[in-house]
């Protein structure tokens, strides 16, 4: 029989080779796993199943293969009218790492009170039953499909079972209760396994499907949509990781861009102390920004929009060519061509955006040939934040890094003399236009679906990370 450690090691190696750097990683910590598995157990009425455990039949089945023990059981059972679990509670689950790779241990403590009715006494004899169910969550590969998480090896061990009489009664009744507990000790683990483990399996499968639905739900963009799909699951420490691929769709639901595994380093995906995190690779962030802010041409009648800057530009041009400055009319016009959409750079200190534009100055709106054309490389501060469950991005603080004179009909000049004026033009025209396209934000339902009302975005080298906000 193959050692499970070897299988896990080979599987883990396969996953690492196949998906070194996924476009996005959803990291679910033990807090989220416990919360959602507990809810799934409640949905399947796990405590009601415990209250229906067939204690008497379980003791009989356990002793049936041993004639002497079977005779003893029958003798004891003659003094019992009925016996059942009167109350049951599932205590706080524990999720912890396994000694094997790609495996988690889930411990489910149970606290039950059982009662039996005997003609030896008018009151019900009650005793406490405490035990624990243990199951393993593993990454397993199917012959017919990709790897998935599976729950296996669900069992209840006699070593975790504790039985005690709640109230001491007469010597005869106490002796009967002691004999019953002695018979339950070997029988109860199998009873729990037979009746509760299938429910735990169903609850886990439901939880897993809920996580996948949550992960793959389309995220609306304006225009189009972003969709994630599962590349591979993984287990690291006490956390479940979903390595995700992504695709961008246009307004007609046609795929415009695919993102799968990449040889480019993604980010640090080692689980941290956050209950969950969604980490998105920088190139996917940039593709989303490109969808929201396509390349375009802006036409601005400068004196109508920002008259102060129009006068400042006229004074700057006068220093270069006074005759040309006098030709600037009331309909003085600018054209700004966004040669590229803003390119986001994510680093530990924050996010910046770089963009190349071509700016042309026309004396009036009827002229077809500009005074001059400038190639401008600008950078902005990029701020990511959450507002009303939406991812928001805002650009501010324009800085011009480089200016190149491309065409000039007035005379050759050093474009650096226009830097201050050009900075104001971009600040008052291009940035508001692009921020306006970002104003609707991107809906993020994941935090709320995982049970967290508030979330926050943080920036690290090459990645954007969503985590619950500190309360």
From Swiss-Prot:
A GO-annotated cellular component: extracellular space
Alphabetized UniProt keyword annotations: Disulfide bond, Glycoprotein, Immunity, Innate immunity, Secreted, Signal
Pfam families assigned: LBP_BPI_CETP, LBP_BPI_CETP_C
Glycan attachment points: 150, 157, 260, 397
Signal peptide start and end residues: 1-18
Any one GO molecular-function label of the UniProt entry: lipid binding
Source organism, top-level taxon: Eukaryota
S-S bridge residues: 154-197
Compartment list: Secreted
Single biological process term from Gene Ontology: innate immune response in mucosa
Function: May play a role in innate immunity in mouth, nose and lungs. Binds bacterial lipopolysaccharide (LPS) and modulates the cellular responses to LPS.
PANTHER family from the UniProt entry: BPI FOLD-CONTAINING FAMILY B MEMBER 1
Family to which this protein belongs: Belongs to the BPI/LBP/Plunc superfamily. Plunc family.
Protein name: BPI fold-containing family B member 1
Species for this entry: Rattus norvegicus
């Amino acid at each position: 029989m193959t050692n499970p450690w070897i299988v896990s090691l080979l599987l883990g190696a396969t996953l690492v080779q196949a998906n070194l750097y996924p476009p996005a990683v959803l990291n679910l910590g033990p807090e989220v796993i416990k919360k959602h598995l507990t809810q799934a157990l409640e949905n399947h009425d796990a405590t009601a199943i415990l209250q229906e455990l067939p204690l008497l039949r379980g003791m009989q089945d356990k002793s049936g293969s041993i004639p002497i023990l079977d005779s003893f059981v029958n003798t004891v059972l003659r003094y019992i009218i009925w016996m059942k679990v009167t109350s049951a509670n599932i205590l706080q689950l524990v999720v912890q790492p396994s000694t094997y790779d790609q495996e988690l241990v889930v411990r489910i403590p149970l606290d039950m009170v059982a009662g039996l009715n005997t003609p030896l006494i008018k009151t019900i004899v009650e005793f406490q039953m405490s035990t624990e169910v243990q199951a393993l969550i593993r990454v397993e590969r199917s012959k017919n499909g990709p790897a998935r998480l599976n729950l296996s090896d669900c069992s209840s061990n006699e070593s975790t079972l504790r039985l005690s009489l709640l109230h001491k009664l007469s010597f005869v009744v106490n002796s009967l209760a002691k004999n019953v507990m002695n018979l339950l000790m070997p029988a109860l683990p199998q009873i729990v396994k037979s009746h509760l483990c299938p429910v735990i399996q169903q609850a886990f499968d439901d939880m897993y499907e809920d996580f996948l639905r949550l992960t793959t739900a389309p995220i609306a963009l304006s225009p189009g949509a972003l969709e994630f799909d599962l590349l591979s699951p993984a287990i690291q420490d006490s956390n479940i990781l979903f390595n995700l691929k992504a695709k961008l769709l246009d307004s007609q639901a046609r795929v415009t861009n695919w993102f799968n595994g990449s040889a480019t380093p993604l980010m640090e995906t080692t689980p941290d102390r956050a209950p969950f995190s969604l980490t998105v690779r920088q190139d996917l962030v940039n593709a989303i920004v490109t969808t929201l802010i396509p390349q375009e041409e802006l036409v601005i009648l400068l004196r109508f929009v920002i008259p102060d800057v129009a006068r400042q530009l006229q004074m700057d041009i006068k220093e270069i060519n006074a005759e040309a400055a006098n030709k600037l009319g009331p309909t003085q016009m600018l054209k700004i061509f966004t040669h590229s959409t803003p390119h986001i750079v994510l680093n530990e200190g924050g996010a910046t955006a770089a963009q190349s534009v071509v700016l042309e100055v026309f004396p009036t709106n009827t002229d077809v040939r500009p005074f001059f054309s400038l190639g401008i490389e600008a950078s902005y501060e990029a701020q990511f934040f959450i507002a009303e469950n939406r991812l928001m991005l805002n650009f501010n603080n324009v800085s011009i890094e480089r200016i190149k004179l491309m065409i000039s009909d007035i005379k050759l000049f050093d474009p650096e003399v226009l830097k201050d004026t050009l900075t104001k033009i971009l600040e008052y025209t291009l940035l508001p236009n692009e921020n306006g396209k970002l104003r609707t934000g991107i809906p993020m339902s994941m935090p709320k679906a995982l049970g967290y009302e508030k979330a926050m975005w943080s920036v690290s080298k090459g990645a954007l990370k969503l985590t619950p906000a500190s309360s």
